[in-house]
């Protein structure tokens, strides 16, 4: 369940088999959001809602601190640290596996994995933005994703409706771009966790 929260973030934080299922307005918003993400370089995000946490992004790399779990990904290797049992799992995830753990997989996967439609202007957490609803082309744990962006095409809100009827909500409280993020931020530093048990799955 802890790992599943990664896929809910701006899954980030982030399509259709049949053209008739596409919505031109929704696609334009998603395309512009993806372009803004690519230009933003280093990004620092804080979020609240169902879970509170911090997310740092740079290209394909990310660092996530949420729900008692910290996760680092340097573009090849992923380290996931569970604070409760002081275990670090190390893996080299495949592209397919990254879809379930990369918090910004939505940014690169919406064109192939989702259908989507435009929902108009909505106010979320006191902020007004344009909203798009995405539905997965294949059935799974996620039933739909509601994605709200500002006039600058930065995420304001993400709501993930699960197949069990529950909804996970993420309100973006801070979104800072062009941050100078060192590559070391996206790698696990064993010296900072001397008591952690390393479980190498590579």
Predicted regions and their residues:
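N-terminal leader/targeting segments and the immediate start of mature chains
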Residues: 16-52, 56-61, 86, 188-202
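Short, exposed beta-strand/loop patches in secreted or surface proteins that constitute
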Residues: 36, 52-57, 70-71, 116-123
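Short, solvent-exposed coil/turn segments at beta-strand boundaries
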Residues: 39, 55-63, 72-78, 127, ...
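An acidic-aromatic
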Residues: 52-101, 166-168
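Gly/Pro-enriched, hydrophobic low-complexity segments
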Residues: 119-194, 199-200
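A generic structural motif
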Residues: 48, 65, 81-83, 135-137, ...
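Sec-dependent N-terminal signal peptides
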Residues: 4-14
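Flexible, surface-exposed loop/linker segments and immediately adjacent secondary-structure boundaries
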Residues: 93-127
């Amino acid at each position: 369940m802890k790992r599943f929260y990664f896929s809910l973030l701006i899954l980030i934080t982030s399509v259709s088999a049949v053209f008739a299922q596409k919505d031109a307005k929704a696609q334009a918003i998603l395309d512009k959001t993806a372009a803004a993400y690519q230009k933003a370089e280093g990004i620092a995000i804080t979020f609240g809602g169902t879970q509170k946490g911090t997310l740092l992004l740079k290209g394909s790399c990310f660092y996530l601190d949420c729900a008692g779990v910290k996760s680092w990904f340097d573009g090849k290797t992923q380290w996931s640290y569970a604070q409760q049992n002081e275990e670090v799992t190390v893996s080299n995830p495949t592209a397919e596996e990254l879809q379930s753990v990369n918090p910004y997989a939505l940014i690169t996967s919406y064109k192939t994995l989702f259908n989507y439609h435009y929902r108009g202007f909505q106010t979320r957490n006191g902020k007004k933005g344009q909203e798009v609803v995405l539905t997965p082309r294949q059935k799974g744990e996620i039933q739909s994703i509601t994605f709200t962006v500002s006039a600058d095409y930065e995420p304001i809100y993400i709501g993930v409706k699960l197949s069990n009827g529950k909804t996970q909500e993420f309100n973006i409280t801070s979104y800072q771009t062009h941050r100078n993020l060192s590559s070391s931020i996206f790698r696990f530093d064993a010296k900072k966790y001397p008591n952690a048990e390393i479980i190498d799955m590579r």
